[in-house]
């Protein structure tokens, strides 16, 4: 049995820290905590009213996917990962991740509630898993992995793919709107959320490195390429990014680029060997490393939480 999954009678007490790298990730998550009340969406309505019908359609569907997906991630954490993983440091991270995912879901729901005035359309968007086939396909894939009999390692990769690949193109599409100077509330919340998801993805890679018997490279590649094809279809066929003026082929390449970054972080060879086609995404968290945090997006980092130099807390650790 994997040491991180083995019964641990000390799991109820935090100190002494046994896994300093995992604890450091938890402290980074804690330092980046934010709430929806800190995001000003009051100026978005003016921009929203100026968008084309295609642009509105695209944004509404992306928000609908996001609003549902965080709940799926949380269900996996509650039902599987939090009960399987026995080391305290990881349980701290997963517990905090659940709180953050709730904030993401509330943020997306608030954005839908603000932009969409028709109550029937709101219900349609809030129930996207049932009402939108393109969202249902992604949700079904993620939910399948919650209940899968595969080992923790395989399911860890699947949810790294959900947070690293299934969100990547949608994040990029909203950053594209930021490049155009539109929707400051939406784009700022997107910065915060993509930063959080970048850390969650990095945490999955760190947990993977703690496995003594990880899944094979072939298994990992299979899960990741499956996620890539679903995400490419989502943003080039089901909900094409050309609706907001983005290039579909470049989006396909970008999703492959993100997948390569993920599989490299896991310690395997790249699959696609492509370069990032979106210059505006060069400094965004999904490119990988959590050094994105050190930029303090919008100065959102809790004061003092990461300032201790002792107890192995360091911002210089390179995973």
Curated annotation (Swiss-Prot):
One record GO biological process: deoxyribonucleotide biosynthetic process
Identification of the protein by name: Ribonucleoside-diphosphate reductase small chain
Any one GO molecular function term: ribonucleoside-diphosphate reductase activity, thioredoxin disulfide as acceptor
Subunit structure of this chain's protein: Interacts with RNR1/OPG080 subunit. Can interact with host RNR1 supunit.
Protein EC: 1.17.4.1
InterPro entries in alphabetical order: Ferritin-like_SF, RNR-like, RNR_small, RNR_small_AS, RNR_small_fam
Chain sites annotated for binding Fe cation 1: 70, 101, 104
Induction: Expressed early in the viral replicative cycle.
Role of this protein: Ribonucleoside-diphosphate reductase holoenzyme provides the precursors necessary for viral DNA synthesis. Allows virus growth in non-dividing cells. Catalyzes the biosynthesis of deoxyribonucleotides from the corresponding ribonucleotides.
Family annotation (Pfam families): Ribonuc_red_sm
Names of required cofactors: Fe cation
Paired cysteines (S-S): none
Enzyme class (EC, first level): oxidoreductase
Positions of region (Interaction with R1): 313-319
Residues forming the catalytic site: 108
Family membership: Belongs to the ribonucleoside diphosphate reductase small chain family.
Cofactor note text: Binds 2 iron ions per subunit.
UniProt catalytic activity: a 2'-deoxyribonucleoside 5'-diphosphate + [thioredoxin]-disulfide + H2O = a ribonucleoside 5'-diphosphate + [thioredoxin]-dithiol
The organism of origin for this protein: Vaccinia virus (strain Ankara) (VACV)
């Amino acid at each position: 049995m994997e040491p991180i999954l083995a019964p641990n009678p000390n799991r109820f007490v935090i100190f002494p820290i046994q896994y300093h790298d995992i604890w450091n990730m938890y402290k980074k998550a804690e330092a980046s905590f934010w709430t929806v009340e800190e995001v000003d969406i009051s100026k978005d309505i003016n921009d929203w009213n100026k968008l084309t019908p295609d642009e509105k359609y695209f944004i509404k569907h992306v928000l609908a996917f996001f609003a549902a997906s965080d709940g799926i991630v949380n269900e996996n954490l509650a039902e599987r990962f939090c009960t399987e993983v026995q080391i305290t440091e990881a349980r701290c991270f997963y517990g905090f991740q659940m709180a953050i995912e709730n904030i993401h879901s509330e943020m997306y729901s608030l954005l839908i509630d603000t932009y969409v005035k028709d109550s029937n359309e709101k219900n349609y968007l809030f129930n996207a898993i049932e009402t939108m086939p393109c969202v249902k396909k992604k949700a079904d894939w993620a939910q399948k992995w919650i209940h899968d009999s595969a080992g923790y390692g395989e399911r860890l990769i699947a949810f790294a793919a959900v947070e690293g690949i299934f969100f990547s193109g949608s994040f990029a599409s909203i950053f594209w709107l930021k490049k155009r100077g539109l929707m400051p509330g939406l784009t700022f919340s997107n910065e915060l959320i993509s930063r959080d998801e970048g850390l969650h993805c990095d945490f999955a890679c760190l947990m993977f490195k703690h496995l003594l018997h990880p899944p094979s490279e072939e298994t990992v590649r299979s899960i990741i390429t499956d996620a890539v094809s679903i995400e490419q279809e989502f943003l080039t066929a089901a909900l094409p990014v050309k609706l907001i003026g983005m290039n579909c082929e470049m989006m396909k390449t970008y999703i492959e680029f993100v997948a390569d970054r993920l599989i490299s972080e896991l310690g395997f060879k790249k699959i696609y060997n492509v370069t990032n086609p979106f210059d505006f995404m060069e400094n965004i968290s999904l490119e990988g490393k959590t050094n994105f945090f050190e930029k303090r997006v919008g100065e959102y980092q809790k004061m003092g939480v990461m300032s201790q130099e002792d107890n192995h807390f360091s911002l210089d650790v390179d995973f």
